[in-house]
Regions:
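Amphipathic, charged alpha-helical segments and their helix-to-coil junctions
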Residues: 20-176
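Sec-dependent N-terminal signal peptides
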Residues: 4-15
Length: 176
């Protein structure tokens, strides 16, 4: 009976002592190896510049209207003045609305960014998951995430190169 209790105690200690395995990846490092990421960023940047140009042109037009109004203000009747003021205000509202529609939290640029980058993120997540399952790893942290603070991590726990290889790229070559 004593042996049975001792054996049970040792078995329970053994289960409690089985440590969980941790690893980490550096998604910024992984993304630098993916040509589709660079291509997506180029598309997003191009669209951003195009939108910004349209918005800048709208605000330049508002500025021109305002300067013309200031120059003509003395010569205008009250009705004409109010009409021009309303035109300027309306044009400025439209420019601000365009800015919100293009760059706002639910704007076209945000939607485009999500559409282009989500498949890349899912591809990385799938590769990380497969590698972690294959190596019996319980938790994988992202070293490049601002919410994960890693003061020290041994490179032996870094799965980044494994992920790059799993995705079909070479770890020693980055996309420029």
């Amino acid at each position: 009976m004593k042996n049975y209790i001792l054996f049970s105690f040792l078995v329970l200690i053994g289960f409690g002592a089985s440590a969980q395995k941790f690893a980490y990846v550096d998604t910024e490092y992984i993304l630098k190896h993916m040509p589709e990421y660079k291509s997506s960023l180029s598309q997003i940047d191009g669209m951003s510049q195009q939108y910004q140009k349209q918005i800048d042109e709208s605000f330049v037009e508002v500025d021109k209207m305002y300067k013309a109004y200031q120059a003509d203000q003395v010569l205008l009747t009250d009705d004409m003045r109010k009409r021009r003021e309303n035109d300027i205000i309306e044009k400025e509202k439209k420019a601000k609305e365009m800015q919100r529609l293009k760059f706002g939290p639910d704007g076209e640029l945000f939607q485009m960014r999500t559409k282009l980058l989500k498949p890349i993120q899912e591809k990385i997540a799938t590769a990380v998951s497969e590698i972690a399952k294959g190596k019996f790893i319980d938790f994988v942290f992202d070293k490049s995430s601002e919410s994960t603070m890693m003061i020290y991590a041994s490179t032996s726990y870094d799965l980044s190169n494994d992920v790059i290889i799993k995705l079909g790229y070479k770890p020693e070559t980055t996309i420029k």
